[in-house]
Amino acid sequence: MNLADKVLVVNDNLPIRTNKPVHSGKVRSVYWLTEEDSARLIKDKGYDVPADAPLAIMVISDRISAFDCVWQGENGLNGVPGKGTALNAISNHWFKLFKDKGLADSHILDIPHPLVWIVQKARPVMIEAIARQYITGSMWRSYTKGEREFCGITIPEGLEKDQKLPELLITPSTKGVLTGLEGVPEADDVNVSRSDIERHVEGFNFTKLADIDLYEKLLKEGFDVISDALAEHDQVFVDTKFEFGYVNDAAGNEKLIYMDEVGTPDSSRIWDGSSHRDGKIIEQSKEGFRQWLLNHFPDSDILLNKNRMEERFALARDNKLPESVMMDISNTYVGIAEKVIGSKLKISENPKQEIIDILREEYQLIV
């Protein structure tokens, strides 16, 4: 079996029983289970959810996305070996740590396979909850152009690139395109202030005003938990994106939870600590791949300018990246995952067949 066979690239064609369209995202695919299968699993497995709660199978792929495009490698290597397993292992570790420390639950009910979660359907809060401890990336680019206010927060003059900020900044952006909210542009991923969210509590899908305080608290506490844990491995937690949503427990009580993924190289920037102390930035996240793309293509504006999306999609479609680049990403993801979980990561030899076998034999979900 060659390297490409060990990579799960297409994850929306599994024979999982569903009566709804499969939702296929950039990296994950979601299979909504039938009412009968959801109810059966809740009863048989003892999940702490209402008896009629909708459940889904979430399958992560090894695809690599950046700048809103999915990128492919040469020699048929159209994903990054071990990437999906690494992302899920990291999220599983942090979600468990959050729960153990009394922060909040996640949407994950069961983990049948390293690439698979069984999740409870959540009502998502419509913000990307971003926390920044250092000024870098898009924030630094805006700062160099003279911007000093970010999401309603004014930051001081005289900051330098990659400098630690005076305090952890919460700089949320919209999740999807929100319409009819005064003062909020109708575009995906636009920055919003705390006052914007307070003016449109329901528009951002919060149940009540007090939950804005709660999400900020959970974001800060979650950031600190991950930052402290990574520091033990001499890694710097630079910035991250969390997502939140609402679910009901078995007693019918609504609760705000963490969802999607947390503290991964896809959703966060992580720097090597010793290199940072020497004034060098060694990326331990997808940011290294983003920087490689910016340096690789002569007209990097295509990757940064949202008015050139058609050109960007064509760039990703028509260029096969060197296998060495895909393997460098693999080494980064697997390496940081093994630091986080404290053990060797087991990479599937034949992931698609393994998933089908487990979901058939242990969950009776294969048609």
UniProtKB/Swiss-Prot annotation:
Keywords: ATP-binding, Ligase, Nucleotide-binding, Purine biosynthesis. One of its GO terms (biological process) is 'de novo' IMP biosynthetic process. Its EC number is 6.3.2.6. Pathway: Purine metabolism; IMP biosynthesis via de novo pathway; 5-amino-1-(5-phospho-D-ribosyl)imidazole-4-carboxamide from 5-amino-1-(5-phospho-D-ribosyl)imidazole-4-carboxylate: step 1/2. Pfam families: SAICAR_synt. The keyword Acyltransferase does not apply. It is an enzyme of class 6 (ligase). It catalyses: 5-amino-1-(5-phospho-D-ribosyl)imidazole-4-carboxylate + L-aspartate + ATP = (2S)-2-[5-amino-1-(5-phospho-beta-D-ribosyl)imidazole-4-carboxamido]succinate + ADP + phosphate + 2 H(+). GO terms for cellular component: cytoplasm. Signal peptide: none annotated. GO terms for molecular function: ATP binding; phosphoribosylaminoimidazolesuccinocarboxamide synthase activity. InterPro entries: SAICAR_synt/ADE2_N, SAICAR_synthase_Vibrio-typ. Belongs to the SAICAR synthetase family. HAMAP family: SAICAR_synth. PANTHER family: PHOSPHORIBOSYLAMINOIMIDAZOLE-SUCCINOCARBOXAMIDE SYNTHASE. NCBIfam families: PRK13960.1, purC_vibrio. This is Phosphoribosylaminoimidazole-succinocarboxamide synthase. The gene is purC.
